[in-house]
């Protein structure tokens, strides 16, 4: 995994290969799935591999505290308008933070600032339902 993270900025292709290798060895590693998502979706989030990798990161480690913030920030930037599964993951993650992990609300604020318009509306709706305000 270390190779994938170190290559992510300079060589997405090398990072993709490193994360793919890691997943062959450990297919339930949420961190490897999370790394594969930006490596394969750098320029095209409609890329099925990127969105599948992001989903697998959630499915294999939804509550991994080390991934909650960066994964939420990445998900907020993705075009979720054509993928109800990603919308559901965004809603569930925000709701979980509001109800069970208030110490991570800062991550929601960060995600909100970089979110697409559609994802901002989703985040706003979750906070409105909880009768809370979105953190700065």
Model segments located where?
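Structural register within alpha-helical repeat arrays
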Residues: 3, 36, 71, 107-108
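Short coil turns that delineate tetratricopeptide repeat
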Residues: 27, 62-63, 102
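Short coil/turn linking the two alpha-helices of tandem helical-hairpin repeats
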Residues: 4-12, 23, 37-48, 77-83
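Terminal, low-structured helical/coil segments at or just beyond the last alpha-helical repeat
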Residues: 84-136
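Canonical positions in the second alpha-helix
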Residues: 21-22, 56-57, 97
């Amino acid at each position: 995994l270390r190779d994938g993270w170190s290559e992510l900025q300079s060589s997405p292709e090398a990072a993709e290969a490193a994360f793919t290798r890691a997943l062959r060895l450990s297919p339930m590693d949420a961190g490897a799935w999370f790394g594969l998502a930006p490596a394969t979706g750098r320029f095209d989030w409609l890329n099925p591999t990127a969105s599948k990798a992001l989903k697998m990161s959630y499915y294999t480690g939804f509550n991994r505290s080390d991934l909650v913030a960066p994964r939420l920030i990445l998900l907020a930037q993705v075009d979720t308008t054509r993928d109800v599964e990603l919308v559901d993951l965004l809603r569930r993650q925000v709701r979980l933070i509001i109800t069970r992990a208030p110490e991570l609300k800062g991550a929601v604020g960060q995600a909100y600032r970089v979110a697409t318009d559609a994802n901002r509306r989703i985040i706003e709706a979750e906070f409105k339902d909880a009768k809370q305000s979105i953190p700065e």
